[in-house]
């Protein structure tokens, strides 16, 4: 990021802040890059965009994080804009389907891009490698940025990095904020909360990230076959997940990994910071219409 900022002569960065892990790490990385360039942290525009699914907890943590890091906070409530958009396209706002969710994500990206244009800055992407592998991102929504700093960082590593930042924080308030973010359920917060609490929990929907990151590592780093990945997972997660659970989420991984390649085929630039990546310009050159049938067939032949 430091190199990209210097190369483009950008004096401003724009980061969407949700109060979740990924946007937290993206902001921490951006702050570090600005410090290395001797640039004022106030030139980092951290934008919180509350909407239908935003909870008080994540909103408070987002604002507190920006304040403690010394960046500039801008709040853009997108409820009215999204409601008008739904009216324009004939979307029933009481129908919480994929259009309801993606409309919010794309509105947020539009806001960030336009603020970046206003400032002559760069939108910093927040999505991590685990989300990209699963396609757990809105096409041309949070999927898009001008530079994705987390693009090769798996979700499990995001958590460790944020915890490291909490452990080495220079203020108790910043540490407490980071620890509360770590303790918050992973969620895109696109569905209204229940009794003020997050109702949409990512790992309930797509499976545990520690499993998916394990699958991703062995598939991309070593090219292991599905049955081999399954056997390794049985050993690695013995006593944590039973065989049926591992097989269920491994099938989910392969199904989504193949079906969602079209999102990875047009990823923005980002650094490779580990041993595997899903960039079409790097480790993963895969056609968007590749079929998962052979891999799924091998999994279907497994007898638990």
Per-region residue spans from a language model:
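ATP/NTP-dependent adenylation/nucleotidyl-transfer catalytic domains that generate, transfer
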Residues: 1-19, 23-304
